[in-house]
């Protein structure tokens, strides 16, 4: 999972993620927006979940982050899982609205994002 942090002309941090993980970048850009307290909450939840069967989720305005002891899922809130009813052409839409990754990989991005934000 590759990522890049940039600052736009106004100084706002933007995250770009590799293909298949774009939604994670959107979560940082739309939900985190340099709010390090939210990252603290996510890291605390990850520590609590490690080695357990429990899960945790944080619904935001545009995206929801869901996590268990092994995996992180970020999905667009407007994405409805219709199961077998999903049309064949909807896979591309689904990839633009849902990303999965391991907890450790996600926490590495969180730590790198925090470091980048603090380098003002």
UniProtKB/Swiss-Prot annotation:
Domain of life of the organism encoding this protein: Bacteria
Q: Name one Pfam family in it.
A: UPF0231
**InterPro entries according to UniProt:** UPF0231
- Entry-linked HAMAP family: UPF0231 (MF_01053)
Q: Which family does it belong to?
A: Belongs to the UPF0231 family.
Record's protein name: UPF0231 protein YacL
């Amino acid at each position: 999972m590759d990522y890049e942090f940039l600052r736009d002309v106004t100084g706002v941090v933007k995250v770009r993620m590799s293909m298949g993980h774009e939604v994670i970048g959107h979560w940082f850009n739309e939900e985190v927006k340099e709010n390090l307290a939210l990252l603290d909450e996510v890291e605390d939840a990850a520590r609590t979940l490690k080695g357990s069967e429990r899960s945790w989720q944080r619904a935001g305005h545009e995206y929801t982050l869901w996590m268990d002891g092994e995996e992180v899922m970020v999905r667009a809130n407007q994405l409805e899982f219709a199961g077998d009813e999903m049309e064949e052409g909807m896979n591309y839409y689904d990839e633009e609205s849902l990303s999965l990754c391991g907890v450790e990989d996600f926490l590495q991005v969180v730590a790198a994002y925090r470091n980048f934000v603090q380098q003002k």
